[in-house]
From Swiss-Prot:
Keywords: Cytoplasm. GO terms for cellular component: cytoplasm. It comes from Lactococcus lactis subsp. cremoris (strain MG1363). Its main location: cytoplasm. Disulfide bonds: none annotated. It comes from the Bacteria. The lineage of its organism: Bacteria, Bacillati, Bacillota, Bacilli, Lactobacillales. This is UPF0291 protein llmg_1475. The keyword Aminoacyl-tRNA synthetase does not apply. It is found in: Cytoplasm. Belongs to the UPF0291 family.
Length: 80
């Protein structure tokens, strides 16, 4: 799930309002939902990036990618 620029702007708007004057209960709930969506998006993007990494030993040139990561990559069709 990706978060839109409008959602990020709304998160920032609510943060500014909270600091300046406080938020209503509805706004607090909206802020919590938007923040959760934002964090879920960041986590998904980070996981996607990590799952495509291949670790190579500089000295030997061997693939030293952890087995757990290799298994995930195989499940996603990125390894033999």
């Amino acid at each position: 799930m990706t978060i839109t620029n409008e959602q990020v702007e709304r998160i920032n708007e609510l943060a500014r309002k909270k600091k300046a004057e406080g938020l209503s209960e509805a706004e607090l709930e909206e802020q919590a939902l938007l923040r959760r969506a934002y964090l879920d998006s960041v986590k998904a993007n980070f996981r996607s990036q990590v799952e495509t990494i291949k670790v190579i030993d500089e000295k030997t040139g061997e693939d030293v990618t952890p087995d757990k990561l290799k298994e995930i990559q195989r499940k996603n069709g990125m390894r033999d």
